[in-house]
């Protein structure tokens, strides 16, 4: 097995995840079995309880792990499901070391960072690769070289090269070369210091990748090679591009794939990058455009909805369209009248309400769902967005005045959304939700079944992350009022009826909402069916509007 470790220097948020995923895509395009591991030096066990404003979205894997958003990048770029155990945190490592100490596994030993913590880190990396059946394992070390939190991990990967041999381990270091407009020059000193810091802990990079605004000129590449003792053909420029899906193509053009094959003693192969070329062409030169309004809670931090944004991009590729996102702060909709709603949501070709937690902005999201329902605007609800759609329908169509979710009002007269029975005895917050892949039985003859390619009905799987569900006590009343329950998970313990997985409104141009998070399974070459159908409906709505305008003009 071969191992590629990716570290970062100078500043955080340089894009190590995208760089690692892009390299993985180049290796996958050459036919290698690749998997990815993300190391996060924080003491949290996982990302599940962290603030979206600070950490971005929590990406949920098929196995139910709540992980760093970079795992989502790996799944999208590599077009595979990353197995459990591929997001390693300091909290996980120390928890296991302490468990072993208490169990007596280290009897007579003084438990220390070296070798016990570093051995546990190495064990987890190897297990992740073996579990995936990989030939090449990409390991991104989070944080910045020089941070105190990263030191045990850097020591572990230093040992890795000693353990596995030079031909099986490669170190890639990502740094920043800022451009100073006042002096009209690139500054390489931060990169020089970053590599020196990495060398001070015993790691010499085999490849240096440089983030910069534009592609580095040859003289700057030569200077970096000279001062970092890395050959010039191993210094790569990761410059700003229009879309992240251009990064693999830009790196391949510079020869990254060939250099990695040479360093790891692999036979050179020709990559098949046609799917990436076609995807980028569609992104940059679409035949149509569509605007989607996202009524959310974390609109100031788009990374909180990263997979959702990428899913819309994938849906755009499938429909040969550019998807423009209009961010709408749901709190601002709360007090909005008709004029305010029209300003925020008017001219949007579709409205999407994403997942989330907490009461802030809830009434604004309900108004967004009502706006879409009553005006025939395509609507897609994700997780909380489905619960919002049910609350709105219960209040304004089913006649259940005061309907709400128990999450927001435990004294509501009609708790149409309630805590799942199996959650009643749950005390802790971390890792205790309904997580990962769950089956959805789709009803034949519904929009959702058509989208998933099972028009007569069938079972599909999507990822979930929730504690609350549509209250089974109200499903009959909601259906009598015209709401279609198009998908359920049957046989859930503690209830007579199945858990509601999707709802829709018959006769509406497109009103579909799911309890699941289909964005987590969307890929550039395999878009999520609900997202692809949503964008298609939004484009269809544009055509209808244009035809209506033409008819009106003709009649005048």
From Swiss-Prot:
Organism: Deinococcus deserti (strain DSM 17065 / CIP 109153 / LMG 22923 / VCD115)
Keyword Magnesium appears in the UniProt entry: yes
UniProt keyword annotations, A-Z: ATP-binding, Glutamine amidotransferase, Ligase, Magnesium, Metal-binding, Nucleotide-binding, Pyrimidine biosynthesis
Name assigned to this protein: CTP synthase
Molecular function in Gene Ontology: ATP binding; CTP synthase activity; glutaminase activity; identical protein binding; metal ion binding
Active site per UniProt: 383, 517, 519
Amidoligase domain: annotated span: 1-266
Regions that span the bilayer: none
Protein encoded by which gene: pyrG
Residues that coordinate or bind L-glutamine: 53, 356, 384-387, 407, 467
SUPFAM superfamilies the record matches: Class I glutamine amidotransferase-like, P-loop containing nucleoside triphosphate hydrolases
Cellular component terms (Gene Ontology): cytosol
């Amino acid at each position: 097995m071969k191992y590629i470790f990716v570290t970062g220097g100078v500043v955080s948020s340089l894009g190590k995840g995208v760089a690692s995923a892009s390299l993985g895509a180049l290796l996958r395009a050459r036919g290698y079995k690749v998997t990815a591991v993300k190391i996060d030096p924080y003491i949290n066990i996982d990302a599940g309880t962290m603030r979206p404003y600070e950490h971005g979205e929590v990406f949920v894997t098929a196995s139910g792990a709540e992980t760093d958003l970079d795992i989502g990048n790996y799944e999208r770029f590599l077009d595979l499901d990353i197995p459990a155990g591929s997001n390693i945190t300091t909290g996980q490592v120390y928890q296991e070391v302490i468990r072993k100490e208490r169990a007596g596994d280290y009897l007579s030993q003084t438990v220390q960072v070296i070798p016990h913590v570093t051995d546990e880190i190495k064990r987890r990396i190897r297990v992740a690769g073996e579990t995936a059946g990989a030939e090449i394992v990409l390991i991104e070390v989070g944080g910045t070289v020089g941070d105190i939190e990263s030191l045990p991990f850097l020591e572990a990967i230093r040992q890795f090269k000693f353990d596995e041999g030079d031909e099986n381990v490669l170190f890639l270091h990502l740094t920043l070369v800022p451009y100073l407009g006042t002096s009209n020059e690139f500054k390489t000193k931060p990169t020089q210091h970053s590599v020196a810091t990495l060398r001070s802990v015993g790691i010499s990079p085999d490849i240096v990748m440089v983030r910069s605004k534009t592609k580095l000129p040859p003289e700057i590449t030569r200077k970096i090679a000279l001062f970092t003792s890395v050959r010039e053909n191993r210094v790569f420029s990761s410059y700003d591009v229009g879309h992240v899906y251009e990064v693999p193509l830009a790196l391949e053009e510079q020869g990254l794939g060939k250099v990695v094959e040479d360093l790891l003693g692999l036979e050179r192969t020709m990559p098949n990058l046609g799917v990436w070329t076609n995807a980028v062409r569609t992104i940059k030169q679409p035949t149509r455009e569509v605007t989607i309004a996202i009524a959310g809670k974390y609109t100031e931090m788009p990374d909180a909805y990263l997979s959702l944004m990428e899913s819309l991009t994938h849906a755009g590729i499938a429909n040969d369209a550019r998807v423009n996102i209009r961010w709408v702060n749901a709190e601002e909709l709360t007090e909005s009248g008709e004029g305010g709603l029209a300003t925020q949501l008017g001219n949007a070709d579709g409205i999407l309400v994403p997942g989330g937690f907490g009461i802030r902005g809830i009434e604004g999201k309900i108004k967004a769902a009502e706006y879409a329902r009553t005006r025939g605007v395509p609507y897609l609800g994700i997780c909380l967005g489905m619960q919002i759609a049910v609350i709105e329908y219960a209040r304004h169509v089913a006649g259940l005045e005061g309907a709400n979710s128990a999450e927001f009002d435990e004294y509501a007269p009609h708790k149409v959304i309630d805590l799942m029975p199996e959650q009643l005895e749950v005390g802790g917050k971390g890792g205790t939700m309904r997580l990962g892949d769950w089956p959805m039985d789709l009803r034949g003859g519904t929009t959702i079944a058509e989208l998933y390619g099972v028009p007569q009905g069938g079972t599909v799987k999507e990822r979930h992350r929730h504690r609350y569900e549509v209250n089974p006590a109200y499903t009959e009343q909601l259906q009598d009022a015209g709401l279609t329950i198009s998908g359920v998970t049957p046989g859930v313990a503690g209830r007579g009826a199945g858990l509601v997985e999707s709802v829709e409104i018959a006769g509406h141009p497109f009103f579909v909402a799911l309890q699941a998070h289909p964005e987590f399974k969307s890929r550039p070459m395999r878009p999520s069916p609900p997202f692809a159908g949503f964008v298609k409906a939004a484009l269809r709505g544009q055509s209808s509007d244009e035809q209506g305008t033409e008819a009106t003009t003709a009649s005048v």
